[in-house]
């Protein structure tokens, strides 16, 4: 008999909007700013709203509409332990999501390094599945390079670079000239405005420690 469908467990990296003080407008204005800065990454992307620090009075219907108006798709709330608030969130169409325990890096089958020798142009996406990615040319603004392992760029990096895409926290990004729209390791990301001026246009190494991105100059 042919299967109609299958329901399986899976894992995804989702952005989380932390509602710090319950001020929905302030939070969604911030969200809209980020969407405008990197629309190819954030526009129409799913987002979870963390309400751990938001207090007990939240208009979940307004929250959902304002997040949608900001350009992202609200899929659930986390940090919601109060039964009344959970019911209100569900009534507004939110899923109740619990933070997962810190997962260990999962072993993967390592494939040979993928090497790209030509320029990666705007609109292109390169994905190195289960391996490192080496780009021996420039990555244009509007391009996206993704690797489950590390990323090495021996040219200007102006597009988006996403390393550790399947959750490898040890992944790093090595770049000869960082001018990136977005950099990400294992779901932790910076937009261009987070890259300090002292590193902009320079050779850098970007790594992850305790879920925080670190950047340092690329030196011998």
Curated annotation (Swiss-Prot):
* Membrane-spanning intervals of the chain: none
Can you supply a Gene Ontology BP term from the record?
A: division septum assembly
Q: Which UniProt keywords apply?
A: Cell cycle, Cell division, Septation
Record family assignment? Belongs to the MinC family.
Q: What is this protein's function? A: Cell division inhibitor that blocks the formation of polar Z ring septums. Rapidly oscillates between the poles of the cell to destabilize FtsZ filaments that have formed before they mature into polar Z rings. Prevents FtsZ polymerization.
Quaternary structure note: Interacts with MinD and FtsZ.
Q: What's the protein name?
A: Probable septum site-determining protein MinC
* Record organism: Photobacterium profundum (strain SS9)
């Amino acid at each position: 008999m042919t299967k109609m469908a299958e329901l399986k467990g899976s894992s995804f990296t989702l952005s989380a909007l932390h509602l710090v003080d319950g001020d929905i407008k302030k939070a969604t204005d911030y969200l809209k700013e980020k969407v405008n800065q990197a629309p190819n990454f954030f526009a129409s992307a799913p987002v979870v709203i963390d309400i751990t620090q938001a207090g007990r009075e939240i208009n979940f219907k307004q929250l959902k509409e304002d997040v949608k108006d900001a350009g992202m798709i609200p899929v659930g709330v986390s940090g919601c332990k109060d039964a009344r608030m959970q019911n209100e969130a569900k009534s507004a169409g939110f899923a109740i999501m619990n933070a997962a325990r810190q997962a260990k890096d999962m072993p993967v089958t390592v494939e040979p390094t993928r090497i790209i020798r030509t320029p990666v142009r705007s609109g292109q996406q390169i994905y190195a599945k289960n391996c490192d990615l080496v780009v021996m040319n420039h990555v244009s603004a509007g391009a996206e390079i993704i690797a489950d392992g590390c990323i090495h760029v021996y040219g200007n990096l102006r597009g988006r670079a996403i390393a550790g895409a399947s959750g490898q926290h040890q992944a790093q990004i090595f770049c000869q000239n960082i001018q990136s729209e977005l950099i990400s390791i294992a779901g932790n990301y910076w937009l261009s405005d987070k890259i300090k001026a002292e590193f902009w246009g320079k050779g850098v190494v970007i790594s992850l420690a305790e879920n925080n991105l670190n950047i340092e100059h690329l030196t011998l």
